[in-house]
Amino acid sequence: MAKYLTQIIVMGVQVVGRDFAKALRQEFAASQAAADARGHAGHQSAAASNLSGLSLQEAQQILNISKLSPEEVQNYEHLFKVNDKSVGDSFYLQSKVVRAKERLDEELQIQAQEDREKGQMPKT
């Protein structure tokens, strides 16, 4: 009976070990993908996120913007007026809208600067 109990325990440990190793590999792959995505954003964008307290993705969600363009950032005007305190809405929401617009403006400036730098680089 002890022999069977030992076999059951060993088999259970093997199954758990395999599943743990598989989960560890998946987590490692996911963290590598996230690191690659952050790496493409650039150091200036990360610094802008730290200063404003909002990531680019959060700012886009607040202003309901799918892609970053100056035309879509104009959605800010509507959301700012709708959440005006004098109309009876929340000053907190209005300040979130303002911070989101500031963050997107910073990102647009960073992109414009990067485009200018790419244009000035000599072609080889």
From Swiss-Prot:
Keywords: Membrane, Mitochondrion, Mitochondrion inner membrane, Phosphoprotein, Protein transport, Translocation, Transport. It is a peripheral membrane protein. The keyword Protein transport applies. Its main location: mitochondrion. GO terms for biological process: ossification; protein import into mitochondrial matrix. It comes from the Eukaryota. The modification Phosphoserine is found at S69. It is found in: Mitochondrion inner membrane. Residues 58-109 are annotated as: J-like. InterPro entries: J_dom_sf, Tim16. The keyword Calcium does not apply. One of its GO terms (cellular component) is TIM23 mitochondrial import inner membrane translocase complex. PANTHER family: MITOCHONDRIA ASSOCIATED GRANULOCYTE MACROPHAGE CSF SIGNALING MOLECULE, MITOCHONDRIAL IMPORT INNER MEMBRANE TRANSLOCASE SUBUNIT TIM16. Regulates ATP-dependent protein translocation into the mitochondrial matrix. Inhibits DNAJC19 stimulation of HSPA9/Mortalin ATPase activity. Belongs to the TIM16/PAM16 family. Probable component of the PAM complex at least composed of a mitochondrial HSP70 protein, GRPEL1 or GRPEL2, TIMM44, TIMM16/PAM16 and TIMM14/DNAJC19. Interacts with DNAJC19. Directly interacts with DNAJC15; this interaction counteracts DNAJC15-dependent stimulation of HSPA9 ATPase activity. Associates with the TIM23 complex. The J-like region, although related to the J domain does not have co-chaperone activity. This is Mitochondrial import inner membrane translocase subunit TIM16. The gene is Magmas-ps1.
